[in-house]
Every structure is written in C-alpha cells, then in structure tokens.
C-alpha cells in the first residue's frame, strides 16, 4: 500500500510538468456577440460573468488550472464549450446557425443546464437567479427572432 501511494505521488508530481496552454485566441470586437447585437450592459454583464469563461476567447483561468490532471479536464471543457458556442466569433456564424445557437442558449439557461454545476463550484458568483435566467432566455429569444426576421427570404 505504501509503495502504491509513493508511485501515485511521483506520478502526480511528474504530471505537473505538463501544463495546459492557457493562451486565449485573439479577440476581434467586431465579431463579438455583445458588440454586434448591441447587448444592454446589465445583460452583457450577466453573459460575461456566467458564459464567457467557457464560451468565448476571453477565458479567465482559475487557480486550479495550474494543477494537473484537473487542468487537462478544464482545458477540454473550455475547448468543447468554444466549439459548441463561441460568443467571440459569433459574427462568423451563418444567420441560421446564429438563430439556432440562440434558441439552444435560451433553452439551456431556462432548463438550468447552463452554467454547468461543475463550473459553479469554482465560480459561485456565476450562478444565475431565476430572474436572471428569465431575462437571459428572453433576450436570447428576442435576438433569435430578430436574426430570423432580418435574414428571412
């Protein structure tokens, strides 16, 4: 048992020498959702606080991002989040995709699927109140409808 613990400790120490890349991709404000949709500041603040760490190129890495293997899991989570929806590159999405992503965002916020519980453990200030959830879902749906109307044939 003692040998197993020593081996595990050595492995834990060794993996600390393999950090994640915390470089955020460049941000072009002209492609950012909050800018192109002229999001009102109170709603923009909520989106930045509760969504942007995983769904933008403006991730603020927490202290535990220095500890492996937790950091590897965190990096994978952020990469997956950006792949699903990246507010920093929202303007590059086709209008149909924009509308679909906004519909999904509204549903996920309403159904309490976002922000993830695992994210809230390290970011309790990102937790949304019921009124914030309603406000965000309504905002996403409003922008979704505007996007669909503007781009209807």
Report each predicted region and the residues it spans.
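The canonical Cys-X-X-Cys-His
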Residues: 47-58, 114, 136
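Sequence/structural segment immediately N-terminal to covalent heme-attachment motifs in c-type
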Residues: 39-52, 74
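Acidic helix-start/capping segments at beta-turn-to-alpha-helix junctions
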Residues: 61-75
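Extracytoplasmic electron-transfer domains, predominantly the class I c-type cytochrome c fold
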Residues: 72-122
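C-terminal capping alpha-helices of c-type cytochrome domains
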Residues: 111-114, 120, 124-150
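Sequence context of c-type cytochrome heme-c attachment sites
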Residues: 23-38, 87-92, 117, 121
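Post-cleavage N-terminal segment of exported redox proteins
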Residues: 1-34, 142-153
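Soluble non-cytosolic domains of exported or imported proteins
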Residues: 37, 41, 45, 96, ...
